[in-house]
A protein has these predicted regions:
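N-terminal glycine-/charge-rich "phosphate-binding" loop or analogous flexible N-terminal tail
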Residues: 1-52
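Phosphate/diphosphate ligand-binding glycine-rich loop within oxidoreductases
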Residues: 52-105
Length: 105
């Protein structure tokens, strides 16, 4: 059976983010297909995540109800926050559509 690589769309990334995640992704346990976007995640930018199973978002990204619906519509299954907070995530809208995880406090 052939397993395809998990595709991750990283939003609001800087060069230092890319270096860190690319280095970590070299580990044989990972090998994800990573796409980086400098733009922040918002309703207008959410469609560029199409084709990714996972979105990695940051503290200033907008995960409002509209963004969550768009991510769900384009096939995203998981939002991984690169921060401890998640007050920018509409968890009510995400329920039943996307899983949301974050770094521990």
């Amino acid at each position: 059976m052939i397993h395809s690589k998990i595709k991750i769309a990283f939003f609001d990334t800087k060069p230092y983010d890319r270096r860190f995640f690319d280095e970590a992704n070299q580990n044989a346990r990972f090998g994800f297909d990573i796409r980086y976007y400098e733009t922040r995640l918002a309703p207008a930018s959410a469609k560029i995540a199409e084709g990714a199973q996972v979105v990695c978002a940051f503290v200033n990204d907008d995960l409002s109800a509209e963004t969550i619906r768009t991510l769900h519509d384009v096939g995203v299954e998981l939002v991984a926050m690169r921060c401890a907070g998640y007050n920018n995530v509409n968890l009510t809208e995400a329920h039943g559509k996307l899983r949301v995880v974050r770094v521990p406090d």
